[in-house]
Every structure is written in structure tokens, then in C-alpha cells.
């Protein structure tokens, strides 16, 4: 049975959704200056968006997509730019081209969504002056509703859904089989830890889909890009991202050995991230039953063919992790930590150049089912 808007039971609003925005501002350590890999994902996804609009977006004689009314687009997990602007322009251009083939031209309204402590000031200061859309910011967790029912025609989410709403409680419980002592992630850990992370991802992704099912119009599209695994047979520990997480943990332990932080603070720190396989994603979408999977696959990323760059990688990881690390350990550890981290990256250069090829930038094209 196809789920209807009114039959979808929304998950309860989380009592404590963790928010870990990317490093704000526009200095040398900011996310806006250190997100070229993420831009590569968006550039690679442009062809996917063009094809999805051309083949899957039914505009002709469809009152849901009346060109007299604005065509509304939402970017969930927009961060601080400029990548979100590239993604939104790709969508606007694709939809506009299709409307023009029907001799129609709507106005476009783009909504930029992220947590309330995202640096929206930097985002809106850098809005393209010649943009072809009206812009608005929408603060709030995308794991819950942030828009009215049937209000969004095209949803987009890039490199955001691997961030969990919270760390799985089992891995912080000393009496649990999943207690993750001495590690900051599920890289190379026991199966109980991996299971706890996947369980949290499953709950979060289901909440995301339920919320979007209420907000997206029937026939509306959603394109998702997420770092993940090409299949369930590939271990996260055998990927470049897995090695990045592992070395961040070992770098923190070096600070413990130097007496800069204590071991208990590392034991109580875990990264709220899960990198899913295609099978993980398909399972949750099919259980949700509100969207059809129009396309799923792996994006070709141009940087995968470049030599591993230690300094650039260290800066990118710092831009992503600085806020969550500062919140737990304080900002005084950042410089010594990333000095050690850069050294560890250099020492493992040969491993990265091989393992990073096993990472997968996954994409999904989903279409909202009819009631």
C-alpha cells in the first residue's frame, strides 16, 4: 500500500539533536575555503540532475507544477557555501530548460536549510549577485519537518545525511557490548559497535524520509549524494574515509600520551557519522514506501585520479571536524592535534593512495509516490 500524507506517522521530535556545523567564516581553516572535494561531488552529480529533470519530472499539463506559481527547491544541509549555490544553480537551469521547452517560465524560490548554529551570515553574504532565484534560510534539523505539507517540488541533500542526529547511546555505555573504549568511530571495531551505528543511521534516515514525504509534492524529486560504500562487502576500515577517521583517533591518543588531554575524554568522544552501502540505503527507502528509487549509483569523482595531497586533506578534515572537536576537547588542542594528524597522514601516504580508491560517492534519485 502506498503511504498517504495523512497516514505517515511522524517520528517524535528528538529531545537532543546534536548539531555539529562545519567551520564557519571564510578564513584559511573555514569550510567555505576547504570543501573542494564536496564541490567535486556536486559537479559530478550535475549530469544526474539534468537526466532526472528531463526524464522523471512530469511538468506538462500537471497542476502540481503550475508555472504561474513559484517552483520551490530546498537544499537540506546547505552549510556555508559556495557549494550549495552551484548545486542550486544546476537544478534551476535544468528545470528552467524543461519549462522553456513547454513555452513556460516560472519563478524559482530556493530554501537553504541547516542547523540553527550554521554560519548563515557567511552563506548569505556570498549569495551570487546574478542568481536566478529568490533565496531564504530555513534553520532546523532535517531529521524533522521544516516545511509545510506539499510545499517543495525538488529536494536536494549533498554530503549531509552521513551525519547522525546523535551518537548511538550503546557505544557510550560501559556496560554495553558496544562500548567503544579507546576509539572514536566504528572503524576496525567490534560488530556490536557497527550494529549500533547502523541502527542509529536507520532511525535517522527513516525520520528524514518521513519528513520529506510530507513536504515534497506528489511527483516531486529528491536527489541525494552521500559518502558511502560501493557494497556491503567493503569494510569501512578499508576505505580512505575509514583511514582518515582511524588516524584522527590515533592522533588524539598521542595527545593523551603527551599529557595534553586525558584518556577518559577520548573514551567519551565518538564521531556521529555512518557511511552506508547502497544496500543500507535501499532497505530503508523500501521500508519507508513513500518514494520510488528512480536511479542509484556511484558518482565519478575527478579528484579520485589525483595524487593524495596531505596538506589539503588535513585542512579539509579540520574544517569538517573543528566544531565537534572544540565542543568536546576545547579549542586549545586544535593546532597540536592537526600538527600530529598531518604527520600521521604523511606517514601513511602510500596506504591512502590505494585505500582512497575504495571510497564511493553514492547518489540517489527518488520520486514522491502518489497518494
UniProtKB/Swiss-Prot annotation:
Activity sensitivity to pH: Optimum pH is 7.5.
Q: So which cofactors does this thing need?
A: Mg(2+)
List of residues binding loganate: 37-38, 162-163, 241, 245, 273, 316
Binding of Mg(2+), residues: 180, 267, 269-270
Reported impact of residue 37 to A? Abolished activity
Q: Give the residues the record marks as binding S-adenosyl-L-homocysteine.
A: 31, 78, 83, 114-115, 141-142
Under which pathway is this protein filed? Alkaloid biosynthesis
What is one Pfam family matched by this protein? Answer: Methyltransf_7
Catalytic activity, reaction form:
loganate + S-adenosyl-L-methionine = loganin + S-adenosyl-L-homocysteine
Could you tell me the Gene Ontology terms of the biological process aspect for this record?
A: indole alkaloid metabolic process; methylation
Sorted alphabetically, which SUPFAM superfamilies does this protein's record hold?
S-adenosyl-L-methionine-dependent methyltransferases
The effect of disrupting this gene, in the record's words, is: Large increases in loganic acid accumulation.
The function of this protein is: Component of the seco-iridoid and derivatives monoterpenoid indole alkaloids (MIAs, e.g. vinblastine and ajmalicine) biosynthesis pathway. Catalyzes the methylation of loganic acid (6S,7R) to produce loganin. Weak activity with secologanic acid as substrate. Inactive on deoxyloganic, dehydrologanic, epiloganic and loganetic acid.
**Which family, according to the similarity comment?**
Belongs to the methyltransferase superfamily. Type-7 methyltransferase family.
This chain's protein is named Loganic acid O-methyltransferase
What does the organism's lineage look like at the top? Eukaryota, Viridiplantae, Streptophyta, Embryophyta, Tracheophyta
